[in-house]
Design a protein with these regions (language model features):
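Conserved P-loop NTPase "ATPase switch" module shared by AAA+ and STAND
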Residues: 213-229
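Conserved nucleotide-binding/hydrolysis micro-motifs of P-loop NTPases
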Residues: 4-6, 121-125, 133-134, 193-196, ...
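C-terminal regions of RecA-like/P-loop NTPase motor modules
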Residues: 143-144, 151, 156, 178-182, ...
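Proline-centered loop/turn at the N-terminus of a beta-strand
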Residues: 114, 254-256
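Cytosolic-facing regulatory segments adjacent to core modules
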Residues: 76, 110-213, 228, 331-333
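Flexible beta-alpha connector loops of hexameric P-loop NTPases
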Residues: 163, 190-195, 228-240, 267-275
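TOPRIM fold recognition
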Residues: 1-51
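The Walker A/P-loop phosphate-binding site
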Residues: 40-150, 175-178
Length: 348
């Protein structure tokens, strides 16, 4: 305030001209300094001024390699695995998108990387049971494995059934639990119903890095039921906002973020395309990798979706609809065992 102790600049000029002039000049210098600071900050945004940071980023990336999903064909399509970015898996119901992403999370954890799973629909223990069920099935199929040991999720969690299980069946389940326990310490499951949004996810990631020193892979199941950023906004607006925030999270934390997306209007009989994600423009434009699941043979003459859905072994295709830094259009074939929560590549 150039007037200082006086009521206005006019009085200051009359009663203390020198100090008033000095105050005005100081204010002008401050304004010039602020303007220069803004100019310098703007000029630093040029690509030329960012080259050193760019080179430093390349050097730093040596210590943050891509993270394999555990599926060889998928990793090959993704240039080795998951990188910093937003990965979205979408499908109609009954194609196993939650099972697939949960299995990917487990396989990442088995390799020693922490994974944060935000389950907005399934309970924590149900997710754990799905993983243990998968292990019972895999063990039962090994040479000399106990065939009756393969158990569904319900077969794992329903305590009453244990009164009817043989000791060998119980031992088989306990062995699967032990196998799961070998990497379960790398999996952190947060469950919620309508109360987990982008900010809660960001804070949990921040806390995990602070408390463990590890940057986790982030999994959200699923996108459309995240807590709305603005309750009065439309579903589309809130989904768009969530996608943008998850993209920002992946960039700020330099980690892969995987989100499951539902298809509300897609048909089982129509091949999956980018149009299935049109309900949210942000999914289409902000995601780095967009993968749609469909039954093998979808769209071909004679294809029967109901018959495909009834099979105990379902042939599923992963279609790479968008890959910001790689090939698009690839179709990867998988065999899905819905009873035992397992996806496998035919060549495995």
């Amino acid at each position: 305030n150039p007037a200082g102790q006086f009521k206005d600049p006019n009085e200051a000029l009359q009663r203390d001209r020198e100090n008033f002039r000095a105050a005005v000049e100081a204010g002008e210098r401050l304004g010039e300094e602020e303007e220069q600071a803004k100019r310098d900050a703007y000029l630093k945004t040029s690509a030329g001024n960012r080259l050193i940071d760019f080179i430093d980023g390349i050097t730093a990336s040596v210590n943050t390699p891509c993270i394999p999903t555990g599926f060889d064909e998928l990793d090959a399509a993704l240039d080795g695995g998951l990188y910093e970015g937003l990965y979205i898996f979408g499908a109609v119901s009954s194609l196993g998108k939650t099972t697939l992403v949960t299995q990917i999370a487990d396989q990442i954890a088995q390799a020693g990387t922490d994974v944060l799973v935000f389950s907005l629909e399934m309970a924590r223990y149900e997710i754990m049971a799905k993983s243990i069920s998968r292990h019972t099935f895999q063990a039962a199929r090994r040479p000399g494995g106990y065939k009756k040991g393969a158990k569904t999720t319900r077969g794992i969690t329903a305590g009453k059934r244990y009164t009817e299980y043989s000791q060998e069946e119980k031992d088989h389940i306990m062995a699967a639990i032990d196998e799961y326990g070998q990497y379960a310490g790398h999996i952190y499951i947060t469950e919620g119903i309508g109360d987990i949004g982008a900010e809660e996810i960001r804070q949990t990631v921040r806390d995990h890095i602070l408390f463990t020193g590890n940057t986790p892979v982030v999994v959200i199941d699923y996108l459309q039921i995240m807590a709305p950023a603005e309750p009065r906004a439309t579903d589309k607006q809130n989904t768009d906002k969530a996608v943008l925030e998850l993209k920002r999270l992946s960039r700020d934390s330099k980690t892969p973020v995987i989100a499951v997306s539902s298809f509300n209007r897609a048909s089982y009989d129509a091949p999956v395309t980018m149009a299935a994600f049109k309900e949210s423009g942000a999914i289409e434009y902000s995601s780095d990798v967009l993968i749609g699941l469909q039954f093998a043979g979808t769209g071909e003459d004679g294809f029967d979706a109901d018959e495909a859905r009834r099979k105990k072994e379902r042939k599923i295709e992963l279609v790479i609809l968008k890959n910001r830094n790689g090939r698009t259009g690839d179709k990867l074939e998988y065999v899905y065992h819905p009873l035992f929560n397992l996806f496998e590549e035919p060549t495995s």
